[in-house]
Amino acid sequence: MLAKRVIPCLDVRDGQVVKGVKFRNHEIIGDILPLAKRYAESGADELVFYDITASADGRTVDKSWVERVAREINIPFTVAGGIRSVEHAQTMLSMGADKISINSPALLNPNLINTLVEEFGQQCIVIGIDSFYNEQSGEYEVHQFTGDESKSHKSAWQTKDWLQEVISRGAGEIVLNCMNQDGVRQGYDIAQLSALRGHCSVPLIASGGAGEIQHFVDAFQKAQVDGALAASVFHKNLFSISEVKAAMAANNIAVRPIEALQETT
C-alpha cells in the first residue's frame, strides 16, 4: 500500500511566504528558504509552492527562489504559478522542481494540459482546482485567479465536470483546494472530497481546512485521499508533522516514517 503524504503548502507573494483565510487577507509568514528547510527536515513527504499572484499578474514563478530551494532541500517539491507554456514548465523542472502544477492557465487553455503531459509525462503534471461551494445554487464551482482578490472570479466550470475534463486530458494528480474551508481550521471538506474521490482515477490531494491532527486522519480514512496539504497549522506551529504521522500510524494509515525520510539526507 502506498504511503499517504503530508504536504506543507507555502503560498508565495513578492518573494515571501504568506497565508490568508478563504483566499483573502494574506499575512506575511516569513522567508521561503528557512520554512522550506524546516519542513523538509521535520518529516514532510513533499512541499508545494504556490506563487499566488503570478497567473493574475501575467507572469511566471520567480526562478531565483526555485533554484535556491532545490539546492537546499532533498524532498520532492511542486511549483505553481503562471506556468502557461512548455518553456515555462521546462524552466521550473530544470531548476529542480519535481512537479509543476497549473490552475488558472489550464482554465484559460485546457489544451495546455495535453501539451505538458506529452512533453514531460503524466507523473509530473498536477492540476490545482479552486472549488467554491455556492450555497444558493448548491453547486461546487471552479474559480480562477484566486490569488488576487481584485481578479478572482467564477469560471464556467462546475468542479466535478472540470475534474473529469482534466483527467481525460492526462493530469497526473489533482489538488482540490476547498475555498470555503481555506484557513479556517475547521476540517477538510470531507463531503466534497468523498464525492469526487469516485470520479478521480489519479491521486487526489486534499487542501483547505486542517486545524487539528484528527482532521488529517479523517481526510485519509473518510475521503480516501492520497495526500493532505496544510499551511497555517504548520506555519503557526500548532502541531508538528511528526505528531500528524504518529496519529496516522496509530490509525493504521500507511505512512512513510520520518526516520526513512531522514536516511535519504
From Swiss-Prot:
List, from the UniProt record, the residues annotated as the active site of this protein. Answer: 11, 130
- Chief location category: cytoplasm
Enzyme Commission no:
4.3.2.10
Compartments, record wording? Cytoplasm
Q: Entry's Pfam families?
A: His_biosynth
Among SUPFAM superfamilies, the record links this protein to: Ribulose-phoshate binding barrel
Keyword terms: Amino-acid biosynthesis, Cytoplasm, Histidine biosynthesis, Lyase
Q: What does the record give as its pathway? A: Amino-acid biosynthesis; L-histidine biosynthesis; L-histidine from 5-phospho-alpha-D-ribose 1-diphosphate: step 5/9
Q: Does the keyword Amino-acid biosynthesis apply?
A: yes
Tell me if Ligase is a UniProt keyword of this record.
no
Q: Which GO terms describe its cellular component?
A: cytoplasm
Which InterPro entries does the record associate with it?
Aldolase_TIM (IPR013785), His_biosynth (IPR006062), HisF (IPR004651), IGPS_HisA/HisF (IPR050064), RibuloseP-bd_barrel (IPR011060)
GO biological process: any one?
A: L-histidine biosynthetic process
Catalytic reaction(s) noted: 5-[(5-phospho-1-deoxy-D-ribulos-1-ylimino)methylamino]-1-(5-phospho-beta-D-ribosyl)imidazole-4-carboxamide + L-glutamine = D-erythro-1-(imidazol-4-yl)glycerol 3-phosphate + 5-amino-1-(5-phospho-beta-D-ribosyl)imidazole-4-carboxamide + L-glutamate + H(+)
Functional note: IGPS catalyzes the conversion of PRFAR and glutamine to IGP, AICAR and glutamate. The HisF subunit catalyzes the cyclization activity that produces IGP and AICAR from PRFAR using the ammonia provided by the HisH subunit.
Q: How does it assemble?
A: Heterodimer of HisH and HisF.
Q: Which HAMAP family match?
A: HisF (MF_01013)
* UniProt record similarity statement: Belongs to the HisA/HisF family.
Name by which UniProt lists this protein: Imidazole glycerol phosphate synthase subunit HisF
